[in-house]
Regions:
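Extracellular "leader-to-stem" segments immediately downstream of a signal peptide or signal-anchor
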Residues: 2-12, 16-84, 89-102, 106-221, ...
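Beta-rich accessory regions
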Residues: 38, 69-74, 337, 356-357, ...
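Short, ordered loop/turn segments at secondary-structure junctions
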Residues: 49, 53, 116, 245, ...
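Short, T/G/N/S-enriched strand-turn elements that build extracellular solenoid repeat scaffolds
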Residues: 72-75, 91-100, 229, 238-244, ...
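Short glycine/acidic-rich loop motifs that flank beta-strands on beta-rich extracellular proteins
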Residues: 80, 94-95, 114-116, 136, ...
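Mature catalytic domains of secreted/periplasmic carbohydrate-active enzymes
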Residues: 84, 116-117, 124-126, 226, ...
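Short glycine/serine/proline-enriched coil/turn segments at secondary-structure junctions
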Residues: 94, 103, 328-330, 344, ...
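Right-handed parallel beta-helix
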Residues: 107-108, 146-154, 223-233, 246-257, ...
Length: 467
């Protein structure tokens, strides 16, 4: 037994005690109030076919983004409506969304984005791994728009592969060979330096030779957004990246992206977000909530807040639902429920990752009714020492508090709960797991250090009650 208790008792700064029970019903009533605050998109009953503007299917050497963008601009200027991609395979370059436009990809339609990097420059203002810059134009982009949507049962294919985009990560695993353009050849390091030295954003201009891959969808400072039903494949980089957005719904979306840094949905400094009924099969985190990296996050000081995740299936990825690591602006109020996760390649179920480079306050995380077949490492991992080798200005101790799990089951993992705090126990506290069962836990239990007020109530690991 008492292997579990033995592991815990040998670790520092841990308190296992009977605490006041967490009122999950009350917490999720708050999430219902948040959901009511999310503004819904609405579009006039007007339709614009991209083929009426000159777009032709099956022309890989003649991408039709100019026709698509003309249809979008016309629709917006006329008061809004729906721009339709009809059945067929259309090859395109970068697309820019405009206010009051529903970009609708019909069932049977496939939108394939060109891998000609020159089409995506000059760049636009965005963030790359939490750092402000001008980088390659995202494949679908919007800046400062209101009431926009990407809908339909069609497919949007970024065409990332070992032959295009993915080798730029610099890893032979993804097709990189000596002499190829790659982010590790100085571009990423220079951008990190820009952030640490507070270089003005207008001077942070990334070029094609820097190898900084674009996102599939990047919505910058937009509000009232719907992404629904589409299938998103093979992004060069992160798949869905809302940045400084408010009132966002991601519903019924299927994400398949096994590429490097292939995060599924990364709301960054966003407020009032609903992600539901989605499937994620990714090469990195399925959902990763962010709020800026280091000085850039602290400068804006805009937390992500009020995010609801429910009825999703996380099939593959580094983490199911993740906060961080670019989380310097902080995070509050996450509600996760009724999700399924199952893969030997899924590393962690719930993950919080940050460091003394980042700082920030992360609080109020509520997770219930999550069923996990298996994960590679831990059901819950909180790590305040993420990427300790990172070159940065340190001294910004983060705080993680009020993290609560209930009715979470996992059939196989290495650990139950893994918490890596700082040298004291002041920066991770008030964490609880209740009414949960973790079976076939290889290392026998939990590993916790640098934390306090950790409560386990009716938590069974390998059939034994953790006391």
């Amino acid at each position: 037994m008492k292997k579990v208790i033995g592991i815990i008792s040998l670790l520092l700064s841990v308190t296992l005690a009977t605490a006041n029970p967490v009122d999950f019903d009350k917490a999720f009533k708050e999430s219902a109030k948040i959901e009511k605050q999310i503004k819904k998109t609405s579009f006039p009953d007007r339709t614009y076919l991209i083929t009426d503007f000159g777009a032709k299917p099956d022309t890989p050497d003649e991408p039709c983004h100019e026709a698509i963008n003309q249809a979008i601009v016309t629709c917006s200027l006329n008061g809004g409506g729906t721009v339709v991609v009809p059945k067929g395979t259309f090859y395109t370059g970068p697309i820019t969304l405009k206010s009051n436009v529903n970009f609708h990809v019909e069932e049977g339609a496939v939108l394939k984005f060109s891998t000609d990097q020159s089409l995506y420059f000059p760049g636009v203002i965005t963030r790359w791994e939490g750092l402000d810059c001008y980088n390659a134009r995202p494949l679908i982009y919007a800046y400062g728009e209101t009431n926009i949507a990407i809908t339909g049962k069609g497919t949007i294919d970024g065409q990332g592969s070992k032959e295009a985009w993915w080798p730029m990560c610099g890893s032979p695993r993804y097709g990189w060979k000596e002499g190829m353009v790659a982010q590790r050849n100085g571009g990423r390091e220079r951008l990190l330096m820009y952030g640490e030295t507070s270089t003005p954003i207008y001077k942070r201009i990334m070029k094609p030779e820097d190898g900084m891959r674009p996102q599939l969808i990047n919505l910058y400072s937009c509000n009232t957004i719907l992404i629904e039903d589409v299938t998103l494949l093979n992004s060069p980089f992160w798949v869905i990246h809302p940045l400084f957005c408010e009132s966002l719904i991601v519903r019924g979306v299927h994400v398949f992206n096994r590429g490097p840094n292939g995060d599924g949905c990364d709301p960054e400094s966003c407020k009032n977000v609903l992600i539901e009924n989605c499937t994620f099969d990714t090469g990195d985190d399925c959902i990763a909530i962010k709020s800026g990296r280091n000085q850039d996050g602290r400068k804006w000081n805009i937390p992500s807040e009020n995010i609801i995740v429910r009825n999703c299936f996380m099939k593959n990825g580094h983490g199911g639902v993740v906060i961080g690591s670019e989380i310097s602006g902080g995070y509050r109020n996450l509600f996760v429920e009724n999700c399924r996760m199952d893969s030997p390649n899924l590393d962690r179920v719930i993950r919080i990752k940050t460091s003394t480079c980042r700082g920030g306050l992360i609080e109020n995380v509520f997770v219930r009714n999550v069923a996990v077949g298996q994960c590679r490492e831990a059901v819950l991992r909180i790590n305040l020492q993420y990427e300790n080798r990172e070159k940065c200005n340190r001294g910004y101790a983060p705080t993680v508090r009020n993290v609560h799990l209930k009715n979470v089951t996992c059939e196989k993992s290495k650990l139950g709960v893994l918490i890596i705090g700082l040298d004291d126990d002041k920066h991770v506290y008030n964490v609880s797991v209740e009414d949960s069962r973790f079976n076939n836990v290889e290392k026998g239990g939990n590993q916790i250090k640098g934390a306090k007020d950790i409560t386990f109530k009716n938590l069974y690991i390998n059939g034994e009650l953790v006391k």
